[in-house]
Every structure is written in structure tokens, then in C-alpha cells.
């Protein structure tokens, strides 16, 4: 098991913690990670795009001109796709893009993402992430103290409204509960900032 420092919110070292190699020490499977990220983005799609086919556009019931003798190409409707204001060929309609992946695949991707962060030295463990009041300035100072400036995913063991509201106005900073973290958020962040209790939850869930 690898050992990393545990810091307090002022950035001072207060101890160490061992990371479970079964979660933080595997060889990352990039193909599986790619598939899970693709699935996450597909599931996030609204899928509400919509356009009208030639049969749904109003008007166009009358033949624009007679079939023969005008010198023009033959036309049957002013709402055919080649006309301005005509319908759309194979018009997109609202649909769901979501699909289901196997739990084992998602679990392997999560372990791969966590292992990649650990190998890169981008996991920061805090003994306790707590704030007395909602204060964005103080939360930014905390991230600076622990050297987690920039895009960061801050993980707490349970929902903490004070932490959520203190962090939400800081660009690039995302908060999450330990049981709700996902591969996309982990990879999208430069630093993974974990409450020590949140680390225990992650190891319990994915061990």
C-alpha cells in the first residue's frame, strides 16, 4: 500500500494514510475509462433537438407549376427539402441517448481513474473539511493552502451545504459526496481533494 500525507485545512501535515492498492494501485484501463466517460456524457444529453420533415412543415400542398412545358425542373411541393423553408431530410426528433453499462465495467473505470490520480500525485487528503459559515474567500484560501488551486474535485463523506455553497462560485471547483463521485468528474479535475472520512467511504464502496 502506498502512503500519502494527511493535511489540515491550513496545509500543515498532521499524519499519513495508506491507500488501498486494490483501488488506488491498479494499472489503469484506458479503454474502459473511455467507454464510461462516453456513457456519462451520453446520459447527460438532453436529447430534445427537433426539426420538421417535409410532411410536417405547413403549406406546400399545391404543385408550384405544371409538370411539363415550363423549362423548369419538375417540382411537386414547395416544402421539399431542396426548397427554402422546406422540410429536413431525416429530421432529428427528441430521443434518449442514455444506455446502460455493466457494473463491473464502471467499477473498473472508477478504480482506474483513482489509480491514475494516485500515480500522478494528484490526490490530497484532508483530516476534516469543515467550515463554520458560508465563505467563498475562506474556501479559496483553503484550496490555496493545500496546493489545490485550479480545477479540483472536493469530496466530503456526506452532503455539507456550507461546503457546497462556499465552493460553487469558484471556477473549476466541483464538490461531491463520496458515494456519488463519478469517473468524469475525477478526470476533469486536476486535483482530487478528499476528506479523510470520504476516503474511508470510497475504500468501503469499491474495495
Descriptions of predicted regions:
Residues 1-46, 91-207:
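Extended polybasic, low-complexity segments that bind anionic RNA or targeting/receptor surfaces
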Residues 4, 8, 18, 40, ...:
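Exposed boundary/loop context
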Residues 31-68:
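A short, flexible low-complexity segment enriched in Lys/Arg and Gly/Pro that occurs
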Residues 54-90:
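Glycine/serine-rich anion-binding loops at beta->alpha junctions
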Amino acid at each position: 500500500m502506498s502512503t500519502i500525507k494527511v493535511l489540515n485545512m491550513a496545509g500543515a501535515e498532521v499524519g499519513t494514510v495508506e491507500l488501498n492498492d486494490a483501488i488506488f494501485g491498479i494499472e489503469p484501463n484506458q479503454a474502459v475509462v473511455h467507454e464510461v466517460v462516453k456513457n456519462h456524457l451520453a446520459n447527460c444529453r438532453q436529447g430534445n433537438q427537433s426539426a420538421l420533415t417535409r410532411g410536417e412543415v405547413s403549406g406546400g400542398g399545391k404543385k408550384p407549376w405544371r409538370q411539363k412545358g415550363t423549362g423548369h425542373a419538375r417540382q411537386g411541393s414547395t416544402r421539399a427539402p431542396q426548397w427554402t423553408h422546406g422540410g429536413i431530410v431525416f429530421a432529428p426528433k427528441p430521443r434518449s441517448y442514455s444506455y446502460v453499462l455493466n457494473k463491473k465495467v464502471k467499477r473498473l473505470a472508477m478504480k482506474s481513474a483513482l489509480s491514475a490520480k494516485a500515480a500522478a500525485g494528484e490526490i490530497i487528503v484532508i483530516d476534516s473539511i469543515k467550515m463554520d459559515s458560508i465563505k467563498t474567500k475562506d474556501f479559496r484560501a483553503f484550496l490555496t493552502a493545500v496546493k489545490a488551486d485550479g480545477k479540483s474535485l472536493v469530496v466530503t463523506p456526506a452532503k455539507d451545504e456550507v461546503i457546497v455553497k462556499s465552493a460553487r462560485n469558484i471556477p473549476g471547483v466541483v464538490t461531491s459526496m463520496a458515494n456519488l463521485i463519478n469517473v468524469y468528474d475525477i478526470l476533469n479535475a486536476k486535483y482530487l481533494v478528499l476528506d479523510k472520512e470520504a476516503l474511508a467511504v470510497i475504500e468501503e464502496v469499491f474495495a
